[in-house]
UniProtKB/Swiss-Prot annotation:
The active site is at K74, S149, S173. This is Glutamyl-tRNA(Gln) amidotransferase subunit A. HAMAP family: GatA. The keyword Magnesium does not apply. One of its GO terms (cellular component) is glutamyl-tRNA(Gln) amidotransferase complex. NCBIfam families: gatA. Allows the formation of correctly charged Gln-tRNA(Gln) through the transamidation of misacylated Glu-tRNA(Gln) in organisms which lack glutaminyl-tRNA synthetase. The reaction takes place in the presence of glutamine and ATP through an activated gamma-phospho-Glu-tRNA(Gln). It comes from Synechococcus sp. (strain RCC307). The keyword Protein biosynthesis applies. Keywords: ATP-binding, Ligase, Nucleotide-binding, Protein biosynthesis.
Length: 485
């Protein structure tokens, strides 16, 4: 049920938050053995939060804009008193003493947390295969990956285990799993949503955003979590517009740029066909399609895989077995304990990225790799700026392919990294971007359309995505799937 309809039902007495939360927990119990979307199901907290909503309504108090809405929280967001593992052995037993800004705002808005969702370890991956607690399955085909790193959040929404979910996006970790799982995934402008309480991967790239089954629901969640936070020095101190009010504004005359460099060799033919059909759908709604070129777009992935591991190597230096996190036993000295704790606590992919980042930042190579990557990042941002002088939005596929099978890329890191080829540039430039379902391939797997907007233009992004969603009605003729709600 969309958030707007649910809110009406809750307030007119035809439904209760308690009933709604129990339905979500029952759905989780029925599907979780096969789906494995959650690291931790928080049934007691869900019931307590739902009861508080019902009591507020009974007392004629405002329960909040997301009252009773069930939500899954990616397990790299700190939740006070509830384990936050980052799907890593390193933080398997870590219980944060404080609440992240986004979850704090969600609880004040009346949302109900049903659990912490699975992810690639420390958000490093594109499939959830690097999770220390096992891979999440794709609800459309349990024999395929859900994408990553926010695979658990995408899967739980697609499977109807909760209404919405939160993820984090460093190089596509919201949009790519949204594409693979056939849901809406929104990455806001860098700084639009506070990162306070998000376990850091790459601090200049990380951003938090929602998953939902409709664009309107993503707008409703963004409305709550967006806004300045003095605890985050990168948080933007600018007003938050009414995102829901923007959804139905007319889109006639808007210019949509078809980014030529996104339609590359290796793009699955069905993906290209669906995305080009979506562009024509927007043209039929009154948008003007314009071919746009950003020649350095394809340099994004090489740039990212210098900058992100470099920042990760610095951020993950704090896990030394002393202050918190996993501590290895039977070490002969402090230095041996630190080395052993990190070797045993971090998985292979995390260690690989730490090594890459440490190398890129080393004295002999920092100019050749890290500083050069930052220069290319600036050039990519400038190309986007020039593109947005011509058009209002840019359009690409979200991912080059539909969901792949476990193991298909896990032994080939470069092939796995290419899954984020089309999403990474928006992170490098700090742009808002959204993935919306636009079709299915011959195997019944979802395909995602990506739209990108200038900085702080989430209103326009949501507006166009909503009009496309309403006109295309992709899910009306969806194929049957074993775990999809």
């Amino acid at each position: 049920m969309p958030i707007g309809a649910w809110s009406d039902a809750l307030r007119n007495g035809s439904a209760t938050a308690k009933e709604h939360s129990e339905q979500a927990l029952e759905r989780i119990a029925a599907t979780e053995p096969e789906l494995k979307a959650f690291v931790n199901v928080t049934g007691d907290q869900a019931r307590a939060q739902a009861e508080a909503v019902d009591q507020a309504i009974a007392a004629k108090q405002d329960p909040g804009p997301l009252a009773g809405v069930t939500i899954g929280i990616k397990d790299n967001l700190c939740t006070k008193g509830v384990t936050t593992t980052c799907s890593s052995r390193m933080l398997e037993n870590f219980v944060p003493p404080y609440e992240s800004t986004v979850t704090e705002r969600l609880w004040k808005a009346g949302a109900v947390m049903v659990g912490k969702t699975n992810l690639d370890e420390f958000a490093m991956g594109s499939s959830t295969e690097t999770s220390a607690f096992g891979m999440t399955s794709n609800p459309w085909d349990p024999g395929r990956v859900p994408g990553g790193s926010s695979g658990g959040s995408a899967a739980c929404v697609a499977a109807g285990q909760c209404d919405v979910a939160l993820g984090s996006d460093t190089g596509g970790s919201i949009r790519q799993p949204a594409s693979f799982c056939g849901v809406v995934g929104l990455k806001p402008t860098y700084g639009r949503v506070s990162r306070w309480g998000l376990v850091a991967f790459a601090s200049s790239l990380d951003q938090i955003g929602p998953f939902s089954r409709t664009v309107a629901d993503s707008a409703a969640v963004l409305q709550v979590i967006a806004g300045h936070d003095p605890r985050d020095s990168t948080s933007l101190d600018v007003p938050v517009p009414d995102y829901s009010a923007a959804l139905n504004r007319p889109i006639q005359g808007l210019k949509i740029g078809i980014l030529q460099e996104a339609f590359v060799e290796g793009l699955q033919p069905e993906v290209e066909a669906s995305v080009r059909a979506a562009a024509e759908q927007l043209a039929s709604l009154g948008c003007e399609l314009v071919d746009v070129s950003c020649p350095r777009f394809q340099a994004g992935i090489a740039t990212y895989y210098v900058i992100a591991p470099s920042e990760a190597s610095a951020n993950l230096a704090r896990y030394d077995g002393v202050k918190y996190g996993y501590r290895a036993a039977d070490a002969e000295s402090l230095s041996a304990m630190t080395a052993k704790s990190r070797a045993e606590g971090f998985g292979d992919e995390v260690q690989r990225r730490i090594l890459i980042g440490t190398y890129a930042l080393s004295a002999g190579y920092v100019d050749a790799y890290y500083k050069k990557a930052q220069q290319v990042r600036t050039l990519i941002r400038q190309e986007f700026d020039r593109a947005f002088e011509q058009v209002d939005l840019l359009l690409t596929p979200t991912a080059p392919t539909t969901a792949f099978t476990p193991g298909e890329h896990s032994n080939d890191p470069l092939a796995m990294y290419l899954a984020d080829l089309l999403t990474i540039p928006a992170n490098l430039a700090g742009l808002p971007a959204i993935s919306v379902p636009c079709g299915f391939d011959g195997q019944g797997l979802p395909i995602g359309l990506q739209l990108m907007a200038p900085v702080l233009q989430e209103e326009r992004l949501l507006q166009v995505a909503h009009h496309y969603e309403q006109a295309a009605d992709v899910m009306a003729n969806r194929p049957e799937a074993p775990l999809v709600a």
